[in-house]
Structures are given as C-alpha cells and as structure tokens.
C-alpha cells in the first residue's frame, strides 16, 4: 500500500512550508496544488493559511477552489483546515465583507478588547477538548498546549461543531471544529511540538482508514 496522498491548497495565504513539512513528518505524501482540477484523486485535502479573510476568499474563488472545497466536504473527502483555513469555512467574518465558504454555519469574530489582553492572541495556550472521541484527539490529553497566532475566531451557530476551545483572557474561543471527515484547527499543529505532530499523524491515519489503497508511512 502506498503513502497517504494529501493535496495542500496553495492560494497565496502565507508560508505553507511548515505545514507541508509537518504533514510529511506525519507520514503523508504532500503535493501543493494551485488549481482544483484533480482534487478528488487525492486521499485528503489540507487548507493551511495565514493573513486576512477577504484576500483569502478572493484567491480561493478566483482559482475555483470555493466550489471544489464544498464538493469535497459533501463527498466526505477528508479535509483539514489550519488557522485561516478554519476561518474561511464560516459564512462571514467581521474582518471583511467577502462571503466565506459557508460550510460551517456561523461567523468569524474579533476578540473583544479587555484590560491586559493582547491582540493578536499569540503564543502557547491550552486546549479544552470538547469532542473527546474525535479521531484528531487520539492520544491527546485534555489541557494540551498548542501554538496560536490570530486576532479573529470562529463562532459556529451550532455548538456541536466545536471540537476544542481555549481561553484568551475572559473569552472562550473555538480552537478546533470537527464533523464527519472535516477537521479544522485555529492553532498551528505543525508548530505545536510533539502533540501537534501527533494530531497530524492522527489525521493522516484517519485518511488512511478512509482510503483503503493508502497507508501512512512508518
């Protein structure tokens, strides 16, 4: 059996190098894709990203990825969004005026100012796992530390989407969402040490279980 083949979407939203290297360390064969043609042939899809909501959505739509990502999620093709790749799944964002992908009902909101609170939320913070049996959390203890860099956070209309939260000042924000074969993290697993790498391995192993022709490399 071959290695899990993951398409990493390149839409000019930040440096994808660390995400690709993390996925390769997790046992996947990674290919950067700049157009949606052939996405269905991959075992799974990864959407990393840093930056602003509106330019990201403009790039995704201009390249034809908007429809392609929605179709991939509908057919239960394994999908992992990271940071901005989580936020664009929502319907809209306070950061801009562009509509999101509308895969996750809800809106992306900015952290509320409060005394002593640093915005952006940057650095290590702990995860409260709300979907304890999610495949992403296999072998991951509650209160694991993860690395964040963001000023906005997704607020799903349905709390059942929430797979983990974190606390920034007095505000509880969504750290991860999951449903079916879709997973997304607001934090950067590829920058979150051994447990972050374990999360990426968990995703690769989940993809392998969904695709009997592939298996993660040792």
UniProtKB/Swiss-Prot annotation:
SUPFAM superfamilies referenced in this protein's UniProt entry, alphabetically: Class I glutamine amidotransferase-like
Keyword Lyase belongs to the record: yes
Main localization, broad class: cytoplasm
Annotated ranges, domain Glutamine amidotransferase type-1: 5-213
An example Gene Ontology molecular-function term: imidazoleglycerol-phosphate synthase activity
GO biological process annotation, one example: L-histidine biosynthetic process
Pathway annotation: Amino-acid biosynthesis; L-histidine biosynthesis; L-histidine from 5-phospho-alpha-D-ribose 1-diphosphate: step 5/9
Entry-linked PROSITE patterns: GATASE_TYPE_1
Pfam families membership: GATase
Quaternary state and interactors: Heterodimer of HisH and HisF.
Descriptive protein name: Imidazole glycerol phosphate synthase subunit HisH
Species of the source: Synechococcus sp. (strain JA-2-3B'a(2-13))
Gene name tied to this protein: hisH
